[in-house]
Design a protein with these regions (language model features):
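Conserved core segment of the aminotransferase class I/II
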Residues: 245-326, 339
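Hydrophobic "anchor" residues on beta-strands that sit immediately upstream
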Residues: 187, 221-222, 257
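Short, solvent-exposed loop/turn segments at secondary-structure junctions
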Residues: 45-49, 110-111, 146-148, 169, ...
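N-terminal "arm"/small-domain region of PLP-dependent enzymes with the aminotransferase-like
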Residues: 2-83, 93-94, 375-378
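Conserved core of the PLP fold type I
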Residues: 74-218, 229-251, 366
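PLP-dependent enzyme catalytic core of the Aspartate aminotransferase-like
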Residues: 1-2, 16-22, 68, 80-82, ...
Length: 400
């Protein structure tokens, strides 16, 4: 704990006696914290009750005397409309920068749509190519630290995951371009804005280099999970270049698939998910989607349309989320600076949006830190979870 005069210096410059004094004080503080009997779960980015209450109007948008038809005359209570309500697709079109007729709506989970997309590539192939399961060992690029649930999907299918370091500009594109020369590399996971957990937003050049990729594998897919596209925390939000437009310029639009949802906009358990891509890729996905379902939850889509109206309505709602979230980020960042600033034993992100602060402690210490937090009643994401196979090679990264 940063409580003594000597602790304003980097710890590596301190004497053994100074370090021992800090250790003893830290242990006393730790035992006091343990005695409080706390039970605090910070393992996932879960919206609080106050955030969920911001979208209660979704539940009030429909009632027994409502008009249940959309602008095309489709009765939203019935079967049909395989790709989802046009009005909801138009909202996502504004947010994602892809034409509405190149968007498929799902139910509440974009992760499920990602899983289904990987599953289709594995069992039936991408774009008419041989299914991945018949090509021997296939591989996926995994910018790391990254999203553990992405890695869980590729691990589930036995796809070999290749970690790629995250830089301040996004994934190491030199490495990605080199690895893509291998035809067994079939795709790359991406969280391009306020990346989970680093908070990095991909630079314009990184987005353009993704668009310029010409992988050896013709069935390579960029899984572009734009989960935090409107989740800004400051007056100067990060700007993300539209990858679809860049891919169109390069003639590579078939290989990018964009995902998003209203999970952290309205309700995580009852929102609307979306998938966007080129007309050709959407047509190939339609073949599977129309076998899988006769249509997603149109009543929920209609509720969201009536509540949100358009992309401006989404952005207005997100201001309420910011008012609740930004002070919480400030509490965490102030505590890190107060307790660890200047000691040379940790570094952390200061994101402009998203849901996470990324903390790097000294090499070999992350598991121990997370374990000590657990003993004190604070549950964090497991150390290592932000890397493929749960293996942080440095045992240093912690997602807060």
């Amino acid at each position: 704990m940063k409580a003594t005069a000597v602790s304003t210096r980097k710890m590596k410059t301190m004497s053994a006696g100074e370090l021992e004094a800090i250790e003893q004080e830290a242990l006393r503080n730790y035992e006091e914290i343990k005695s409080r009997g706390m039970s605090l779960n910070m393992s996932r980015g879960v919206p609080c009750v106050e955030q969920l209450d911001l979208a209660l109007g979704v539940l009030e948008a429909l009632h027994a005397r409502s008009e249940f038809a959309n602008s095309n005359g489709d009765d939203c209570r019935n079967y049909g409309v395989w790709n989802g309500l046009l009005e909801m697709r138009e909202i996502f079109s504004e947010l994602l920068g892809v034409p509405a007729d190149q968007i498929i709506l799902g139910n509440n989970s974009s992760l499920q749509m990602m899983f289904d997309t990987i599953s289709q590539g594995f069992t039936h192939g991408c774009g008419g190519h041989t299914p991945w399961c018949r090509q021997g060992e296939v591989k996926f690029l995994c910018p790391s630290p990254g999203y553990d649930r992405h890695f869980a999907v590729t691990e589930y299918f036995g796809i070999k995951m290749l970690p790629v370091p995250m830089l301040p500009t996004g994934p190491d594109m030199d490495m990605i371009e080199e690895l893509c020369k291998d035809p067994s590399v079939k795709g790359c996971w991406c969280v391009p804005k306020y990346s989970n957990p680093t908070g990095v937003t991909y630079s314009d050049e990184t987005v353009r280099r993704f668009a310029r990729l010409h992988p050896a594998a013709p069935d390579f897919r960029i899984m572009w999970d734009n989960a935090y596209c409107v989740h800004d925390l400051t007056d100067e939000p990060a700007e993300l270049l539209n990858i679809y437009d860049e891919c169109v310029k390069e003639g590579t639009e078939d290989q990018v698939i964009i995902f998003a949802s209203t999970s952290k906009i309205s309700f995580p358990g009852a929102g609307v998910a979306a998938l966007a891509s080129s007309a050709k890729t959407i047509a190939s996905l339609k073949g599977r989607t129309t076998v899988q379902t006769i249509g997603s939850d149109k009543l929920n889509q209609l509720r969201h349309v009536l509540f949100l109206h358009d992309a401006d309505g989404v952005k207005s709602l997100m201001k309420g989320h910011r008012q609740i979230l930004a002070p919480k980020f400030r509490i965490v960042l102030d505590a890190l600076e107060r307790e660890l600033g200047g000691l040379g034993i940790a570094r952390w992100s200061n994101p402009k949006g998203g849901y996470f602060v990324c903390l790097d402690v000294l090499e070999g210490c992350a598991k121990r830190v997370v374990g000590l937090c657990r003993e004190a009643g604070v549950t964090l994401t497991d150390a290592g979870a932000t890397y493929p196979y749960g293996n942080d090679p440095h045992d240093s990264n912690i997602r807060i």
